[in-house]
């Protein structure tokens, strides 16, 4: 990457090309009517600025002597001066078709230059004028100018002793015009724009006053480009991209993005950022500052966007919708995670076993299987869990909370997955099918247990007698034979049973219920 350059100020003698932009007829045809008007205004304002700063223009490499065109300007920035042109010619006759019209308009109507000066035209329009012009500048140069090249190539400006910086409008003037038009669209709807930036005049027109030179302008576009011409620090120009700015911090940010360097580093954790604002937000992690507070529930956040996301909980707004299934979400990241269900994308892979996951948090939880880490402890019984969600689900055993209720039978469950499986009893859905015999099941666990019948697998072995079972529940019930445990007690007579099913059958003796009729 080439090193970024700081454009040096143009001091002493400069050509008008340093501040003017010329279009060919083909380029001119690409501009809209609004852009042409803007170009016209900007060139007039540039001419005004040059006059106000005490510049004079004449034919190249000649000593100034007063001829037929004089421009007198009383500037608030300079003492009285007189600028002269060294040849008795129509200036706009030497210009291209665009700049020529602008200079012609400025002189023909004795237009005041923003209220500070005036043109005085004393030109001879005799029939021999063009012939004299050819003899003075040469036939080749005249033909070139007739094709549209500007007279500015043959003119120079003698600057005052004070240094002055001309800012280029930009490599792509069309882009600059579009940018300025967009800025005007965004600000035109603000009711306080005139009170801040403009002074209303008669007829509803507004003057936009430059705060540095006090020069008034008829529109905001001209003021913006004028302020780029004022002496200031910079501009800072990136030699790679061609982008420029008058602010050193903006230039540093741009360079950081291009080089990959993050200039703003956190002193607490060594994390670095491209922008100072991002560093400020990050430091709230260490300070605990939460300046953004929800007006509904008083919950506070360290970032404004977090508050905006949270407020959708109260409003119920779900602006992010899945194109595949129509499901909507309150957060964009939730939509991105959901879309992986449709695409099958699993970007987070375990380095130990190669298993992949949709979400990073699921990978972190899975990795604790390999490390054996169980950082979440139940305060009631001391049991440890790999994830906070598993701990919260377990705590419902102690609290008796069953937040998931079936709308059909009002039966409630501790876990949402249990409710989902239960609802299949009402719907008759059996999504899990055995490939061996075609039998279907409500639950995936039931299918796995059934498949052990076909495979002959009995993974659960009794440590006392060596007997094996298909299901873990069957092993637990069997072990009660060895332990003598009978956990299911009848409330009527106190008789105890190893299995709950046996207790239910026994209770019919007391109720007189006859479940099976002939």
Swiss-Prot record:
A zinc finger (C2H2-type) spans 208-230, 236-258, 264-286, 292-314, 320-342, 348-370, 376-398, 404-426, 432-454, 460-482, 488-510. Keywords: DNA-binding, Isopeptide bond, Metal-binding, Nucleus, Repeat, Transcription, Transcription regulation, Ubl conjugation, Zinc, Zinc-finger. Residues 14-89 form the KRAB domain. SUPFAM superfamilies: beta-beta-alpha zinc fingers (SSF57667), KRAB domain (Kruppel-associated box) (SSF109640). One of its GO terms (biological process) is regulation of transcription by RNA polymerase II. The keyword rRNA processing does not apply. Transmembrane segments: none annotated. One of its GO terms (molecular function) is RNA polymerase II cis-regulatory region sequence-specific DNA binding. Pfam families: KRAB (PF01352), zf-C2H2 (PF00096). There is a cross-link at residues 171, 196, 220, 247 (Glycyl lysine isopeptide (Lys-Gly) (interchain with G-Cter in SUMO2)). CDD domains: KRAB_A-box. One of its GO terms (cellular component) is nucleus. The keyword Zinc applies. It is found in: Nucleus. InterPro entries: GLI_C2H2-zinc-finger, KRAB, KRAB_dom_sf, Znf_C2H2_sf, Znf_C2H2_type. Its main location: nucleus. PROSITE patterns: KRAB (PS50805), ZINC_FINGER_C2H2_1 (PS00028), ZINC_FINGER_C2H2_2 (PS50157). It comes from the Eukaryota. Belongs to the krueppel C2H2-type zinc-finger protein family. May be involved in transcriptional regulation. PANTHER family: C2H2-TYPE DOMAIN-CONTAINING PROTEIN-RELATED, ZINC FINGER PROTEIN ZIC AND GLI. This is Zinc finger protein 776. It comes from Homo sapiens. The lineage of its organism: Eukaryota, Metazoa, Chordata, Craniata, Vertebrata. The gene is ZNF776.
